[in-house]
């Protein structure tokens, strides 16, 4: 009979099979009331599942990340319960957990309106408020199929037919009269599911295939308590104010249009930001001793067959043909960089060779997934590939890590979550090679005093990788940086160098990205700064404003001085009230407004005002220029003080 070992090392002995809920009740009524599920020997199980062998058990509550995920998953079932009561002919597809919430894809014979969503949410609350028990039953495959056939649930039947073995015993979760199928676990009672909000709807193809029927996807968020929900909704409201699509339009940075889905039309001010960011990256490339190259944006399909992309990635590639040859527009830069490496004989003395490119790449992303600058079809990668020997891997990874943190700190990103993905089951190379590669990556992180978590089995088949996920001011996660070892591509494309023993050897290739894509990173920065770009990035850094026509010559003279000093400046000589002009440029997030009246002209000064409304007083022009140059040169995140 089972001996249950708890996280504190204490043990409880039973003469019969017990569930996590039984053990929680044995410990105390408070824990039993809070028990959502159990973690048995590392595996999550339902609170009602029986344990009949010796095991380690942790009781999962709403305070645990796993508990919150279970709450969200059960809220998806609650949505299904409610929608079937309101519109019984609805057919349920899939309802997984996502970041901060859940969704459910439904096949319903009406276009869901905002009023429908509000009605659905109300019914969900009414059901949850009854605190009904959720009953789990393990049944045979045929029993599950019969249950869904009786309810006309064609999508559930398809899941059973295509994804579940006839020998399996699927879990059916009974929410009163509503039944759903899931691996689980789920909450034992709906008292855990009171704090949720339905958010929006969108279209989604069944199985993600555009050849299939378009379903309606209903999104929601769910939390453990009222305070967490309110805090999240407040963050969402702030995120809406910072939406890069809104700010991009307000500041005239770029636009997208139907004739070129997922492609960016950069306007002058947006392109100025792009070029400044590019110049910053280019400066860092020089300091870290990279070559900058430029490969073709299109190559023969034969090349992509050699790399393996044609077999594994062709659905995401744009193609064209000419003179009976088929070409692929590149989705990534790496094959082109190997071709550059292959030109001319390379010696071990030439390594490491660090090759970077602002590569124009295109990927055929589904139209429904496109989202402003964050998800596009045409993008520019700040991509680099390092060709080195196995002995050089550790030092090169070390350098990559330093470069990542060096660049992120410039933008004020301090919270960076790092994960090391290790060997998958299907992989190339020997265990010894993987041992060394994983050890090199871990050692480089440790040498830089970086905390990281392992992701076992999540590496690519051709090598382990480090992922850098930065968190913005709203604590949203953006996976941008990657350091990926590649033991496959150089060999596939016949890359080699002459080693110390005068024999040809295949180099190790390190894929390195920091920003990820220029477009997406500009989107992230737009939201991080809410359009208040630091002065060095701002499209217009200074506007000089006259009060009356009598200061026009002085304004023009100052404008020329600032331009000659390398400052992006505009003169506003319009016949408008000074308050109107200041308000307009403040809304345009121009960092500094220099106001010139008769007093300033006479004294050879300017009245300096920041976009945040701070009055810095009347300053000498030379002092203003010097301080602005210093702020821009240092890429400061803070505006000047007097």
From Swiss-Prot:
Record-linked CDD domains: TGS_ThrRS, ThrRS_anticodon, ThrRS_core
Cofactor comment: Binds 1 zinc ion per subunit.
UniProt-listed SUPFAM superfamilies: Class II aaRS ABD-related, Class II aaRS and biotin synthetases, TGS-like, ThrRS/AlaRS common domain
An example Gene Ontology CC term for this record: cytosol
Spans annotated as Catalytic: 243-534
Enzyme class per UniProt: ligase
Subcellular location: Cytoplasm
Biological process according to GO: threonyl-tRNA aminoacylation
Keywords per UniProt: Aminoacyl-tRNA synthetase, ATP-binding, Cytoplasm, Ligase, Metal-binding, Nucleotide-binding, Protein biosynthesis, RNA-binding, tRNA-binding, Zinc
Cofactor requirement: Zn(2+)
EC identifiers of the protein: 6.1.1.3
Catalytic activity: tRNA(Thr) + L-threonine + ATP = L-threonyl-tRNA(Thr) + AMP + diphosphate + H(+)
GO molecular function: ATP binding; metal ion binding; threonine-tRNA ligase activity; tRNA binding
Span of domain TGS: 1-61
Protein biosynthesis among keywords: yes
Alphabetical list of PANTHER family matching this protein: THREONINE--TRNA LIGASE, CHLOROPLASTIC_MITOCHONDRIAL 2 (PTHR11451:SF44), THREONINE-TRNA LIGASE (PTHR11451)
Alphabetical list of HAMAP family matching this protein: Thr_tRNA_synth
Known role: Catalyzes the attachment of threonine to tRNA(Thr) in a two-step reaction: L-threonine is first activated by ATP to form Thr-AMP and then transferred to the acceptor end of tRNA(Thr). Also edits incorrectly charged L-seryl-tRNA(Thr).
Family: Belongs to the class-II aminoacyl-tRNA synthetase family.
Protein name per Swiss-Prot or TrEMBL: Threonine--tRNA ligase
Organism: Pectobacterium atrosepticum (strain SCRI 1043 / ATCC BAA-672) (Erwinia carotovora subsp. atroseptica)
